[in-house]
C-alpha cells in the first residue's frame, strides 16, 4: 500500500506594515523555504495562509506588531488554527550584521519562533476589553482637547482689555465658559470682533467636549461593570483605573503566566540596579497601568 509522505512543519515569520505584509517561511532546521508579500486585506490574509500551507504543515507563526499593523492578520491566523506568537522587536544584533530589510525582519521573526525566543501570546482584541480600549482612547483625546480649549480661552482673557477680563474671568472653568459662550459683541473694532468670535467658539468647544466626556464616562462605567465588577470593589479602583488594568491584560488574561508577568507588563517589576540594588521599573513612565 502506498502512503502519502507526512508533511513537515514550516514556520512563518511576518514583518507587518500599513499596506503590505512581508512573509518568510523556514523549515525546522532553519532553511528559508520561500518569501512573499501580500496586501493588508482579508483576501491578502487568506492568500498568505493558503500560500504557506501549500509548502508544508503550518502550525506556528511569528508576527510583528500584533497589537497594531499585525492585529488583523493575527486574528485570521488564529481562526485557521495557527499558533501566533508575538515578536516584540527585531533582533538588533542580527540587524547590525545583516542590515535592515523587510524580508530580513520577517526571517528573524520566524527564527525567533524556531529558537523558542518568541513565546509571548498576542493580546486578544475582540471583546469587552477591546471596547474599553477604544472608549479610553477617545476619552484621553477629549480630555486633552478640553484642557487645551480652556487654557487657550484663559490665555486670551489674560491679554484682553481689563474691562473685558473683569467681566468674563472666573476662577471656575464652568462659570468662565458659560459667560464666554453667551457673548454677543465686545465692540466694533476688528480686534474685539475677533476676540468675541474666538472666545465664544472656544467656550462652546469646551462645552461640547464636556458633554462628550460625560457620554464616554458612562460607556466606560458600563463596560467595566460587565468585564471587571470584582476589580471595581477594590479600594481606590474606579472605572478609569479598572479599564487601564483590564486593557493591559487584554481579552485573554490567561496569556499572563504569573503575577510577575503582569507586573513586568505594567512596568512595575523590580529591575536589578547598581551594586545589586533592585529598583522598580520607573524608567518606563509611558505605561499607564504602572503609574502611581
Place the predicted regions along the sequence by residue.
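A detector of single, family-specific signature residues
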Residues: 1-292
Amino acid at each position: 500500500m502506498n502512503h502519502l509522505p507526512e508533511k513537515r512543519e514550516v514556520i512563518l515569520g511576518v514583518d507587518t506594515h500599513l499596506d503590505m505584509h512581508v512573509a518568510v517561511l523556514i523549515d525546522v532546521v532553519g532553511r528559508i523555504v520561500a518569501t512573499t508579500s501580500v496586501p493588508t486585506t482579508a483576501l491578502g490574509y487568506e492568500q498568505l495562509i493558503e500560500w504557506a500551507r501549500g509548502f508544508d504543515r503550518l502550525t506556528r507563526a511569528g508576527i510583528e506588531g500584533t497589537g497594531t499593523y499585525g492585529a488583523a492578520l493575527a486574528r485570521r491566523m488564529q481562526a485557521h488554527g495557527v499558533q501566533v506568537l508575538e515578536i516584540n522587536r527585531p533582533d538588533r544584533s542580527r540587524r547590525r550584521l545583516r542590515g535592515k530589510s523587510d524580508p530580513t525582519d520577517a526571517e528573524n521573526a520566524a527564527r525567533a519562533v524556531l529558537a523558542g525566543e518568541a513565546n509571548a501570546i498576542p493580546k486578544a482584541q475582540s471583546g469587552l476589553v477591546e471596547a474599553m480600549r477604544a472608549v479610553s482612547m477617545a476619552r484621553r483625546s477629549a480630555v486633552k482637547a478640553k484642557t487645551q480649549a480652556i487654557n487657550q480661552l484663559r490665555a486670551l482673557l489674560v491679554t484682553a482689555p481689563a474691562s473685558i477680563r473683569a467681566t468674563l474671568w472666573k476662577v471656575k472653568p464652568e462659570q468662565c465658559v458659560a459667560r464666554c459662550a453667551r457673548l454677543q459683541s465686545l465692540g466694533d473694532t476688528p480686534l474685539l470682533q475677533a476676540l468675541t468670535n474666538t472666545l465664544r467658539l472656544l467656550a462652546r468647544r469646551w462645552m461640547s467636549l464636556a458633554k462628550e466626556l460625560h457620554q464616554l464616562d458612562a460607556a466606560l462605567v458600563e463596560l467595566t461593570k460587565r468585564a471587571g465588577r470584582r476589580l471595581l470593589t477594590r479600594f481606590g479602583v474606579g472605572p478609569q483605573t479598572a479599564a487601564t488594568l483590564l486593557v493591559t491584560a487584554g481579552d485573554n488574561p490567561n496569556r499572563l503566566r504569573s503575577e510577575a508577568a503582569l507586573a513586568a507588563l505594567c512596568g512595575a517589576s523590580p529591575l536589578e540596579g547598581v551594586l545589586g540594588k533592585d529598583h522598580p521599573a520607573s524608567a518606563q513612565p509611558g505605561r499607564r497601568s504602572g503609574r502611581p
